[in-house]
A protein has these predicted regions:
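Hydrophobic transmembrane alpha-helices of multi-pass small-molecule transport proteins
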Residues: 47, 108, 117-139, 195, ...
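Helix-helix packing/entry segments at the starts of transmembrane helices
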Residues: 13, 36-38, 75, 79, ...
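Hydrophobic alpha-helical transmembrane segments of multi-pass integral membrane proteins
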Residues: 4-8, 34-49, 69, 124-130, ...
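A helix-boundary/kink motif common to multi-pass secondary transporters
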Residues: 31-32, 90, 113-118, 176-179, ...
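Hydrophobic/small/kink-forming positions within alpha-helical transmembrane segments
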Residues: 17, 21, 48, 72-76, ...
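Hydrophobic/aromatic residues within transmembrane alpha-helices
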Residues: 26, 35, 39, 85, ...
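Specific transmembrane alpha-helical segments of multi-pass solute transporters/efflux pumps
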Residues: 15, 19-20, 48-98, 134, ...
Length: 300
């Protein structure tokens, strides 16, 4: 991995780590669908301005439909799921569950896209799941139905991420490539189109008790413009440069940022379970991302 790609990966980890902090502020006030919709729609508006200022030519090269569908899978659905999780999980929890993305990517790649699977990777997957299990007892939240709902929401979101990474490589990169800024815009457009009718129905039937104060809307701007618009430009650039599995290793670093942001700015407590679970996931990801040559291939 080149130094530039590594720098982008670190920037993306820092930015996405902060997103869990913002959602923890926003989601309990606005609710699930408003949080998800405002996140992607603000990101979409921000990308429109960025592309206009940079005078980027709007040439999707016949890939607009693919970008829209990717946006639904990679942004719209996960944004909703993480908004659900943010109402019941501390920011650090969501960030650490998000670290299972490469594990999901390995499984999906082997089962659906004929990516090589090794015994080493299988060991990493089970070790990672064990680490996530330890995390369910971390911090101030007792294990109950709400915690389980939040955890399953995060894991469903990471499954979407893993699936979308391979689709992006097949639909975009392997067919001539596409400017990462256009990929990000198309993705946000797709997510916005998916969530718009759901948001409208939600507001009409169950409007939020409060639309929040300045802190909520400043957090929304940060979530939409920095943690989504800017982040997805970086993400699609990394997908093109290093591939979906290596790009997904950004989630290896996100938990550290997520836990630190939560402890520093939201006064969320830290425990040894955070450390043990995070270390297990770190070892699991190292096993999963080792070159296939060091392990014995297993047919999926």
């Amino acid at each position: 991995m080149s130094p530039i790609a590594l720098t982008r990966l670190l920037m993306l980890a820092a930015v996405w780590g902060a997103s869990f902090l913002f959602m923890r502020i926003i989601a309990p006030v606005l609710g699930t669908l408003p949080t998800a919709f405002f996140r992607v729609s603000i990101a979409c508006a921000g990308l429109l301005v960025i592309l206009a200022l940079m005078r980027v030519r709007w040439d999707f090269n016949g890939k607009l439909k693919a970008c829209l569908l990717l946006g639904m899978i990679n942004s719209g659905i996960p944004a909703t799921l993480y908004s659900v999780a943010a109402q019941v999980l501390p920011a650090g929890y969501s960030a650490i569950f998000n670290a299972t993305t490469p594990l999901m990517g390995v499984l999906i790649g082997a089962l659906l896209f004929r990516e090589p699977m090794t015994l080493t990777k299988l060991s990493g997957i089970f070790l990672g799941l064990f680490g996530v299990g330890i995390l369910s007892g971390a911090g101030p939240v007792a294990f109950d139905a709400q915690l389980l709902q939040g955890a399953l929401s995060c894991l469903a979101a990471t499954t979407c991420y893993g699936f979308a990474g391979f689709l992006a490589r097949r639909w975009l990169d392997q067919q001539g490539g596409l400017d990462s800024r256009l990929s990000a815009l198309g993705s946000m457009l797709g997510a916005t189109l998916l969530l718009l009718p759901l948001f409208g129905y939600s507001v009409l039937t169950q409007p939020p008790a409060s639309w929040g104060g300045w802190d909520v809307w400043l957090s929304l701007l940060g979530l939409g413009l920095v943690c989504t618009a800017f982040a997805y430009i970086l993400y699609f650039r990394l997908l093109s440069e290093i591939g979906p599995v290596k790009a997904s290793t950004v989630t290896f670093m996100i938990p550290a940022f997520g836990v630190l942001w939560g402890a520093w700015l939201l006064d969320e407590s830290l425990s040894m379970a955070h450390l043990y679970g995070g270390l297990l996931i770190a070892v699991a990801l190292w096993l999963v991302l080792k070159p296939a040559a060091v392990g014995r291939a297993v047919r999926a």
